């Protein structure tokens, strides 16, 4: 019965189930753990993708890693090859939600 229902289920009902929002955070300079709160609360966040956003010349390699997320924000760690020369960066993020 479930297979029959799914086969006959019109595809237009499946459109727009997963939505995407993007944004850019404020500035982060120091190496460490941070939390970012989304500008709005989502019903259900499925995932978050992040990337380092740097304008100008970088003095050293920067990395950011997602450590967790929920419906109101995400947490991440900013790491740097040479912590003493850390650059000021922003984090570009993508939120996947329903």
Language model features with spans:
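Short, exposed beta-strand/loop patches in secreted or surface proteins that constitute
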Residues: 11, 62-69
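Extracellular receptor-binding modules and their adjoining Ser/Thr/Gly/Asp/Asn-rich linkers
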Residues: 1-44, 77-98
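Cysteine-clustered segments with highest specificity for TGF-beta superfamily mature ligands
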Residues: 69-78
